[in-house]
Amino acid sequence: MSMSSRHLHSSIVNPPPPEYINRKKTGRLTNQLQYLEKVVLKALWRHHFSWPFQQPVDAAKLNLPDYYQIIKNPMDLSTIRKRLEYNYYSKALDCIQDFNTMFTNCYIYNKPGDDIVVMSQELEKVFMEKIAEMPHEEIELSVVGNRGVKSRIKISAVAAEVCKKKMVSQKMHRRTFPCPVIAMMPKRTTLVPLSVIRSSTSSHSASSVSKVNKGIKRKADTTTPAVSLIATSCESSPTLSEPKPNKILSGTEKTRSAETSAVDLPDSQHHIHFIKSNQICEQLKHCNNILNEMMSKKHAEYAWPFYKTVIPTSLLDCSDAIKHPMDLATIRDKMENGLYKDTQDFASDVRLMFMNSYKYNPPDNEVVNMARKMQDVFEGMFAKIPDDPLATQSMVERYKTSTEESSSSSSSEQSSSSDSEDERAQHLALLQEQLRAVQEQLKALTETPIFSKIQPKSAVGVYDKYKQWVKCIEPMGKLLKRKKNYDAKKKKLHVSDEEEDVKPMSYDEKRQLSLDINKLPGEKLGRIVHIIQSREPSLKDSNPNEIEIDFETLKQSTLRHLEKYVMVCLRKRPKKPSSIKSLKSKEQLNKEKKQELEKRLRDVSGQLSSAKKPKIQGFLYPMQSIGGPSRLSESSTSSSASDVSNSSDSSSSDSSDSESATFPKNILAKKQTSTNYEVPLLLYYGCFVNKPRTSIPQNGLCIGSQSLAYTTISTIVHPTPMALMPLHPGSTNYTSLQLLLKYGLHVPLIIENPLGNSVLFENYLEVLHPSQIEQTFAIKEECLKPKYKNAKVKTSFCWEVFSKSLATTHVTIKSSSNSFQQFRKAAIAKEERERALKAQELRRLEDSKAGMQEKLSPSLPMETKVHEMQAQTIDEATKGEPTCNPVHEGITEEERNLARMREQERRRREAMAGTIDMYLQSDIMATFEEHLC
């Protein structure tokens, strides 16, 4: 610390603390002061945020040289405590003012965001909650000797003033203070106005009777014609002639005195008085119920700032800005004293209270939001009040008099009726203009509040005009509101009828709608969002740039509207309900299977190219159909291609058979001879489809409406002196070819040879009888069988057999079943022997190749070697299998699967024999260490 700061610190002098002894001897002890000492001060002192306020501010210690220059009236909790102990205060309002001074000093000297300000706000919140529970009437207490405290009733004008001006809300005073929820005021009993006394000429002492709440005694309001019974001391006002002022009349005495005073009145005054009082009482009962509802605990969260009158001393500019203050307590007093003539006077005071809040506070203030909520509650309840019977009766009387006058002559009747209609139209137009003008002015006042200290004259003028017009506008507003409610109900009924007529959308339709929406271009999606937001109220306020839609939550009418729009955008025809939806739903799955097959075949061909001498190159061309896209071709492609992909995994080699066997027979039954289709497919022996050389013009296939065509088989055979190796393991089964021949599909087949020699011939087979298809398949199987004996391929047999098949396709084959079965068994046995020899040779070659690779690449990771050995094991096991034929009488399918699994396990054990499982070793070590611990 520098010398200057030390000198400044030493030069700060604290002023003497505030005095706590009343030298004028005007101090008293009342029930409210006792409550402030024992309840309010005790609660504040025990609060964990009260420590900065318990002692006077030490400016020298805190190095605050300007504190006492800014704060002219310092105050703290210890000073208030001493003043309460020494009976410094003459009334509770002075003590409350000291508490407010302490909080105000904190807000003046410190910044709004400081910690001390937050602590002060919390203390003030507790203070206001305790003040709300303080007794309403201030009663002086006196101490007599050592016997204790005796209370005697002594109500003065000052005590009554304290009851009226007691502060409840600090939210209206400081805008940064958080909103506390304050307990409600006790419910008061309504005071009955003594209107009889107005008309009578008797003295005030003869009829000064009214209802008084038990335990609560009020001072009479001099501005009110009603007279209240006041309990005073011996020094009370001499105008009352009662000998015992503290005596309260019983209920029978009250009614008896009221009856005697009423008997003296004339009959005409009786009649007029009772009619008016009954009619006004019925209307004001509803207003009183509205007031009780607004002051109930239900609305206390946002109604508490309007309970009591704002103290002008706490807000210096409040009296300048608000010329006509109003609050719920004042409205209640006026209601109890019978100052409201009708419902419109009551409504104008309530609306004035809200207008004052809008004028003084900024629009973003929390008090303004509370006022709006409270006004919504009031307007909703006030609109339910039935019409004034006096007004309706006067209108009926006017109508009767006008009709009586108009009935004097026919000519005058016609003119008066036309005049009355014109007057009604003019009056209605005038009312509408006035209503529009008042609404605009009220809107302008609520949106742009007045912050200046001086209230403009225009605002006062608007308020006066508003009070003048409100009686005329009210019936019109009710009519407009009823019409609006009727239109809303009618519209709601119309929408509900529309919802009932719409057919519910199934799950498949919703899924197809989602797929179609995803196909739409970007510029069409904006319309989709607009349709959903316009028809769904819950999504109306959502962000149109990013919206998440759940079809299960949308209305059926919205879904159908979206379906129509999507069909128009995609130019689709509405589909008839049929079983074809299942095929279309597999369209995406088939494309995914196709891509996965391409990837797998590339990987397998790359891995096996180094281990096999004979090489076969296959290419998978894009699937095309001349007449347009065909789902049948795609599904057939996926089913036949799945044979090759699934055969790579020995455990799932039969899944493709089941998938291919589910080909729809009901579609095949509807074949026609008018159109032909070429279906490119993944085929037998690992060869791939190629585009057919000859193209036949044809129409697109419409599933469900058009039939399938006759298919053709276009085969290209290359005589190969070397062994034809399958590109994928397990592709030697004839399941795919059997199904293709069975269903008559077009099969372009390519078998390439390194020598480059190729022979092309095409054969267009018609759909045959199943017996003809089986015999043709047996012949083709023998023709397509690979041979390894010589360097030359004997193709003469294939040519002869194929020429015979061409010649016999249109002729019924009448061969005996025995000769066919013998021929078939001989062909299968021969093929099995050849494959066994092939498997042995390939196994020896692969074993030698694997040994060479292990010697050349010792650094190869062991896991990759294991995977290669497993792949080779699967290849050899599947190559050595016989064809899956239901007619075969040899080894059954279960035995083959068991042998395959044994061979896989043996190969896996051989591959894992030279490896060490480090994970197992680490687990063993971890278990050992755990047991040691």
Curated annotation (Swiss-Prot):
InterPro entries: BRD4_CDT, Bromo_Brdt_I, Bromo_chromatin_reader, Bromodomain, Bromodomain-like_sf, Bromodomain_CS, NET_dom, NET_sf. GO terms for biological process: male meiosis I; male meiotic nuclear division; positive regulation of gene expression; regulation of RNA splicing; sperm DNA condensation. The record marks 110, 115 as: Histone H4K5ac binding. Signal peptide: none annotated. A motif (Nuclear localization signal) lies at residues 214-225. It comes from the Eukaryota. Residues 423-448, 829-917 form a coiled coil. Residues 495-577 form the NET domain. Residues 404-418, 630-660 have a biased composition (Low complexity). The keyword Coiled coil applies. Pfam families: BET, BRD4_CDT, Bromodomain. Residues 1-21, 235-263, 398-425, 576-610, 627-662 are annotated as: Disordered. It is found in: Nucleus. Residues 28-134, 278-385 form the Bromo domain. Residues 584-603 have a biased composition (Basic and acidic residues). GO terms for cellular component: nucleus. Keywords: Activator, Bromodomain, Chromatin regulator, Coiled coil, Differentiation, Meiosis, Nucleus, Repeat, Spermatogenesis, Transcription, Transcription regulation. The keyword Transcription applies. Bromo domains mediate interaction with histones that have acetylated lysine residues at specific positions. Bromo domain 1 mediates binding with histone H4 acetylated at 'Lys-5' and 'Lys-8' (H4K5ac and H4K8ac, respectively). The bromo domains also recognize and bind a subset of butyrylated histones: able to bind histone H4 butyrylated at 'Lys-8' (H4K8ac), while it is not able to bind H4 butyrylated at 'Lys-5' (H4K5ac). Belongs to the BET family. This is Bromodomain testis-specific protein. It comes from Xenopus tropicalis.
